[in-house]
Amino acid sequence: MSHAVLKSALAVFAIDPAAIGGLWLRARASPQRQAFLDCLAACSPPLPITRLAPNISDDALFGGLDAAATLSIERPVFRSGLLDRDAILVLPMAERCDPGLAARLAQILDNKRHSIIALDEAAEEGEGVPPALIDRLGLFVNLDGLRFKSILEPIEINAIVAARALLPKVRVPHMLVTEVVRA
């Protein structure tokens, strides 16, 4: 993957991560992957970045009844979940994501309020991010084989801010959308 393609992927994601759905990042834990993620964070995405545990519970995601607090004060107490606020969700070890969690995360992406960075550390060809998530992630970046010196510098933040401001004015002809989808 070339430097220009990496920079373009970062820019597209940083401009409107919720609209793009997310980013499938194939790379083992490495200085290259961390440099890419640091560069993404430096682009000041419009949503906060939250790291998920690979085995996160539904209560932690969606919130729910806090049993201990409810028993303590003898009336229902609800606690919020991570999904109560819009965010970019970083999913480590996405290749090991449980199908049920993948389905719930896919459903979340359909609301266009969240985005996911799926960190795919798959070592073998048969492993990978669950298809339910892949279908909703608009970008794929493969850092395998890149040397550390080829990782890019942060994108000019003023360009990202300007692109965000122009985004509502962009109109794409239906025929162009059809052609891109067919390609």
Report each predicted region and the residues it spans.
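Conserved ASCE/P-loop NTPase catalytic core
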Residues: 1-137, 141-144
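Basic, amphipathic alpha-helical bundle interface domains used for macromolecular binding and assembly
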Residues: 102, 147-183
